[in-house]
Amino acid sequence: AXAKIALIGAGMIGGTLAA
């Protein structure tokens, strides 16, 4: 995986937890 995929995945998880 690329770094971009990791960043996007982390962002989605963070957004879900924040919501």
UniProtKB/Swiss-Prot annotation:
<keyword id="KW-0816">Tricarboxylic acid cycle</keyword>
<keyword id="KW-0560">Oxidoreductase</keyword>
<protein>
    <recommendedName>
        <fullName>Malate dehydrogenase</fullName>
        <ecNumber>1.1.1.37</ecNumber>
    </recommendedName>
</protein>
<comment type="function">
    <text>Catalyzes the reversible oxidation of malate to oxaloacetate.</text>
</comment>
<keyword id="KW-0520">NAD</keyword>
<feature type="binding site">
    <location>
        <begin position="9"/>
        <end position="14"/>
    </location>
    <ligand>
        <name>NAD(+)</name>
    </ligand>
</feature>
<comment type="similarity">
    <text>Belongs to the LDH/MDH superfamily. MDH type 3 family.</text>
</comment>
<dbReference type="GO" id="GO:0030060">
    <property type="term" value="F:L-malate dehydrogenase (NAD+) activity"/>
</dbReference>
<dbReference type="GO" id="GO:0006099">
    <property type="term" value="P:tricarboxylic acid cycle"/>
</dbReference>
